[in-house]
Amino acid sequence: SRQHKRSGRESLDCALMLQELTDMGVENIITFDAHDPRVHNAIPLKGFESVSCTYQFIKYLLLGVDDLHIDSQHMMVISPDEGGMGRAVYFANVLGLDMGMFYKRRDYTKIINGRNPIVAHEFLGSNVEGKDVIIIDDMISSGESMIDVASELKKRGASRVFCATTFGLFTNGFKKFDEAYENGVIDKILTTNLIYQPEELLSKPWY
C-alpha cells in the first residue's frame, strides 16, 4: 500500500492490512521496495523485510549501456522527492556517486483530484550539466512527476536521463512517455517484472 501516513481522520490502511495478515497467522512478510519501510512498526513483533531492487538496476545499466562512465564527474543519482531520499542515498553510495533531490512545491489552497497540485519542482544538489543522471523511485504511477523531474534536469544541462523504478504502473498510458522519449527528455525507463508488463510496454524503445 502507498498510504504510509495519515492525513486528518483517515485510516492507516497499510498498517491495518499488515495487522490483519498477522492476525491470520502470518509470521513473516517479505515485500519489495516498500513505499516507507517504517510501516513495519505496525507489527513490531513479526518479521518484515523490504527487499531493494538496486542490484537489478545496476546490472542492467552495466550490461545494457555501453558508454556509461560510473563516477561522480560523469553521473549523478537523483531522488524525485524528499520521500525517496533514503533509496537514492543507498543507490548513490553503492555506485560512489553524488546525489541530488527535488522537492515538490505545492499549492495548499487548492485540491485537485484529491491532492494539492504541484506548483514547481525545486532542485537541491550540485551541477548536473553534462552528466548522465539516474532518477530512482519506488514506482511510476501516472508518470507526470517523473517526466517533470526529467524535464527540469534537461533544462539544467543533463546529458542522458535514466529512470529506474521498481513498479511501473503507467496508469495514464504511455503517450506522455512516448512524447518525452521523442523529445529527448528521457533515454530509458527501467522497471522490474514484479507486476504485469503488457506487450505494448515491452515493445517500447524507451523501455
Tell me what each language-model feature is.
Residues S1-Y207:
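PRPP-associated nucleotide enzymes
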